[in-house]
């Protein structure tokens, strides 16, 4: 067997559940599907009404999954996923419950945390609804592994989770935090870097210049603090420090 056939034989079908499929979530999912050696199939919902996606999106995603399994001519060994990859906007326990009659019980499940509803900066004047943080938490309990997109994200979640769970009078899951932490890890979101010709330095004469490249790969929203980013750029510029952007 040659290397190409071995590589092909190892490929598996993965269902990627994306309940809020827009912006960075869609870019990440699409990039993974394009570059993975596996057959990554996207099951998605439009990126709007985020609260409703977390509350009711599991039903629509389950219906899409069942439609794939029941498609004319579909054979179970061809269409059943070898693994499930779900984003944080998916109510994972609800989806797994709805799919319990259709998926093998041992199907591995990975939860990918783009963000969470416990430490996510809340708009000024609005009160945080802990319902959605609990959906995140129970999804972590249901997953075999939990990936966070940064070390800061992971550490801030596990620093705050015990304070969330202490709100509840009994059976408060505090004993589960350590177990979930042990199966959590950091998996940064990949990016498509620009070509040298399209990433000419600000203040640099040509593509052979070597100032450091500063990359902003976040949404242009209040919670990402673009004001601080620009303040830093202003300081670098005022100091005469060369950089590329």
Residue ranges and their predicted role:
Residues 1-49, 53-72, 77-83:
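N-terminal subdomain of nucleotide-sugar transferases
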Residues 119-138, 162-172:
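Nucleotide-sugar donor phosphate/pyrophosphate-binding loop at the beta->alpha transition
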Residues 191-192, 205-224, 230-237:
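Conserved donor-binding/catalytic core segment of Leloir-type glycosyltransferases
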Residues 142-203:
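Donor nucleotide-sugar binding/catalytic pocket of nucleotide-sugar-dependent glycosyltransferases
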Residues 17, 149, 187, 214-218:
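Short hydrophobic "strand-cap" motifs at the C-terminus of beta-strands
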Residues 102-121, 136-148:
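Active-site proximal beta-strand in glycosyltransferases
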Residues 11-14, 209-214, 243-244:
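Charged active-site motifs of nucleotide-sugar-dependent glycosyltransferases
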Residues 12-15, 66-98, 105, 110-112, ...:
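Short N-terminal targeting/anchoring amphipathic segment
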